[in-house]
Protein backbone atom coordinates (compact mmCIF):
# COMPACT_ATOMS: atom_id res chain seq x y z
CA UNK A 1 0.00 0.00 0.00
CA UNK A 2 1.36 3.45 -0.81
CA UNK A 3 2.06 5.54 2.27
CA UNK A 4 2.20 9.29 2.81
CA UNK A 5 5.66 10.80 2.56
CA UNK A 6 7.13 11.21 6.01
CA UNK A 7 10.40 11.46 7.84
CA UNK A 8 10.28 7.67 8.24
CA UNK A 9 10.27 7.11 4.46
CA UNK A 10 12.67 4.43 3.19
CA UNK A 11 15.96 5.26 1.51
CA UNK A 12 15.28 7.21 -1.69
CA UNK A 13 16.57 5.65 -4.90
CA UNK A 14 19.20 7.57 -6.87
CA UNK A 15 18.20 8.12 -10.51
CA UNK A 16 19.07 11.01 -12.82
CA UNK A 17 16.02 13.15 -13.61
CA UNK A 18 14.86 13.49 -17.23
CA UNK A 19 14.96 17.33 -17.30
CA UNK A 20 17.30 19.46 -15.19
CA UNK A 21 15.63 21.83 -12.75
CA UNK A 22 12.22 20.12 -12.83
CA UNK A 23 11.07 18.36 -9.65
CA UNK A 24 7.62 17.09 -10.74
CA UNK A 25 6.87 14.51 -13.43
CA UNK A 26 3.30 13.28 -14.01
CA UNK A 27 2.20 10.28 -16.07
CA UNK A 28 -0.05 11.29 -18.97
CA UNK A 29 -2.77 8.84 -17.90
CA UNK A 30 -2.95 10.62 -14.52
CA UNK A 31 -3.49 13.96 -16.28
CA UNK A 32 -6.29 12.38 -18.34
CA UNK A 33 -7.91 10.82 -15.24
CA UNK A 34 -7.76 14.09 -13.27
CA UNK A 35 -9.09 16.27 -16.10
CA UNK A 36 -11.91 13.80 -16.89
CA UNK A 37 -12.84 13.78 -13.19
CA UNK A 38 -12.76 17.60 -13.10
CA UNK A 39 -14.90 17.86 -16.24
CA UNK A 40 -17.50 15.52 -14.70
CA UNK A 41 -17.57 17.64 -11.55
CA UNK A 42 -17.82 20.83 -13.62
CA UNK A 43 -20.86 19.45 -15.44
CA UNK A 44 -22.47 18.80 -12.03
CA UNK A 45 -21.31 22.22 -10.67
CA UNK A 46 -19.16 20.50 -8.01
CA UNK A 47 -15.51 20.57 -7.10
CA UNK A 48 -13.65 17.25 -7.16
CA UNK A 49 -10.52 15.89 -5.52
CA UNK A 50 -8.30 12.87 -5.18
CA UNK A 51 -4.89 11.70 -4.02
CA UNK A 52 -1.77 11.20 -6.15
CA UNK A 53 0.62 8.28 -5.74
CA UNK A 54 4.06 7.66 -7.12
CA UNK A 55 7.67 7.64 -6.09
CA UNK A 56 10.35 9.99 -4.85
CA UNK A 57 13.77 9.80 -6.42
CA UNK A 58 16.98 11.77 -5.97
CA UNK A 59 19.94 12.86 -8.05
CA UNK A 60 22.72 15.43 -7.75
CA UNK A 61 20.13 18.26 -7.88
CA UNK A 62 18.13 16.83 -4.97
CA UNK A 63 14.79 15.08 -4.63
CA UNK A 64 12.18 14.88 -7.38
CA UNK A 65 8.83 13.12 -7.77
CA UNK A 66 7.11 10.91 -10.35
CA UNK A 67 3.30 10.79 -10.07
CA UNK A 68 2.13 7.46 -11.45
CA UNK A 69 -1.51 7.08 -10.37
CA UNK A 70 -4.47 8.66 -8.62
CA UNK A 71 -7.18 7.56 -6.20
CA UNK A 72 -10.49 8.99 -5.11
CA UNK A 73 -13.78 7.93 -3.54
CA UNK A 74 -17.21 9.38 -2.85
CA UNK A 75 -17.08 13.11 -2.22
CA UNK A 76 -19.18 15.71 -0.43
CA UNK A 77 -18.93 18.71 -2.72
CA UNK A 78 -20.50 21.88 -4.00
CA UNK A 79 -19.24 24.64 -6.28
CA UNK A 80 -16.69 26.00 -3.76
CA UNK A 81 -15.70 23.12 -1.48
CA UNK A 82 -14.98 19.41 -1.49
CA UNK A 83 -14.03 16.67 0.95
CA UNK A 84 -14.01 12.90 1.08
CA UNK A 85 -17.23 11.38 2.44
CA UNK A 86 -16.61 9.92 5.86
CA UNK A 87 -18.32 6.70 4.79
CA UNK A 88 -16.14 6.49 1.68
CA UNK A 89 -12.76 6.34 3.38
CA UNK A 90 -12.55 2.55 3.17
CA UNK A 91 -13.20 2.83 -0.58
CA UNK A 92 -10.45 5.48 -0.78
CA UNK A 93 -7.96 3.25 1.06
CA UNK A 94 -8.87 0.31 -1.20
CA UNK A 95 -8.33 2.54 -4.23
CA UNK A 96 -4.92 3.65 -2.90
CA UNK A 97 -3.95 -0.01 -2.34
CA UNK A 98 -4.43 -0.64 -6.07
CA UNK A 99 -2.38 2.38 -7.17
CA UNK A 100 1.01 2.35 -8.83
CA UNK A 101 3.84 3.86 -6.83
CA UNK A 102 4.89 3.44 -3.25
CA UNK A 103 3.74 6.70 -1.66
CA UNK A 104 0.91 9.22 -1.57
CA UNK A 105 2.87 12.21 -2.85
CA UNK A 106 0.20 14.73 -3.61
CA UNK A 107 -3.42 15.56 -4.15
CA UNK A 108 -5.54 17.22 -6.78
CA UNK A 109 -8.74 19.20 -6.78
CA UNK A 110 -10.71 21.53 -8.99
CA UNK A 111 -11.76 25.16 -8.89
CA UNK A 112 -14.81 26.09 -10.94
CA UNK A 113 -14.17 29.22 -12.97
CA UNK A 114 -11.84 30.93 -10.50
CA UNK A 115 -8.46 29.84 -11.82
CA UNK A 116 -5.64 27.63 -10.64
CA UNK A 117 -4.20 28.62 -7.27
CA UNK A 118 -4.24 27.35 -3.70
CA UNK A 119 -6.70 29.09 -1.41
CA UNK A 120 -5.91 29.57 2.28
CA UNK A 121 -8.01 26.46 3.00
CA UNK A 122 -6.08 24.53 0.33
CA UNK A 123 -2.76 25.58 1.86
CA UNK A 124 -3.91 24.50 5.35
CA UNK A 125 -5.12 21.18 3.92
CA UNK A 126 -1.84 20.63 2.10
CA UNK A 127 0.31 21.53 5.10
CA UNK A 128 -1.84 19.30 7.33
CA UNK A 129 -1.15 16.31 5.09
CA UNK A 130 2.42 16.94 3.96
CA UNK A 131 3.87 19.62 6.25
CA UNK A 132 7.23 20.78 4.92
CA UNK A 133 7.91 17.37 3.34
CA UNK A 134 7.78 16.82 -0.40
CA UNK A 135 4.19 16.96 -1.55
CA UNK A 136 2.43 18.50 -4.51
CA UNK A 137 -1.04 19.87 -5.17
CA UNK A 138 -2.47 20.02 -8.67
CA UNK A 139 -5.38 22.39 -9.25
CA UNK A 140 -7.60 22.04 -12.31
CA UNK A 141 -10.05 24.66 -13.60
CA UNK A 142 -12.19 22.83 -16.15
CA UNK A 143 -14.00 26.04 -17.15
CA UNK A 144 -10.93 27.12 -19.13
CA UNK A 145 -9.16 23.73 -19.30
CA UNK A 146 -6.15 24.80 -17.24
CA UNK A 147 -4.17 23.11 -14.52
CA UNK A 148 -1.20 24.05 -12.39
CA UNK A 149 0.99 22.34 -9.82
CA UNK A 150 2.03 23.80 -6.47
CA UNK A 151 4.14 23.03 -3.45
CA UNK A 152 3.77 24.67 -0.04
CA UNK A 153 5.93 25.49 2.92
CA UNK A 154 5.71 27.83 5.91
CA UNK A 155 6.07 30.79 3.53
CA UNK A 156 3.04 29.83 1.43
CA UNK A 157 2.49 28.36 -2.02
CA UNK A 158 4.85 28.15 -4.95
CA UNK A 159 3.94 27.26 -8.53
CA UNK A 160 5.98 24.27 -9.69
CA UNK A 161 7.02 23.38 -13.25
CA UNK A 162 5.70 20.00 -14.30
CA UNK A 163 6.63 17.59 -17.10
CA UNK A 164 4.03 15.15 -18.47
CA UNK A 165 5.46 11.66 -19.06
CA UNK A 166 4.04 9.93 -22.14
PLM features: residue spans?
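Conserved beta-strand-loop surface patch within small alpha/beta domains used
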Residues: 1-104, 113-166
Amino acid sequence: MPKIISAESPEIEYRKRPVKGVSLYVAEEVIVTMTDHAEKGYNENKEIMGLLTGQTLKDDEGIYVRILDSATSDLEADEVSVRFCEGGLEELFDSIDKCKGDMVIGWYHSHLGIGCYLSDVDIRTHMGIFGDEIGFAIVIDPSDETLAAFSCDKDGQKKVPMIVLT
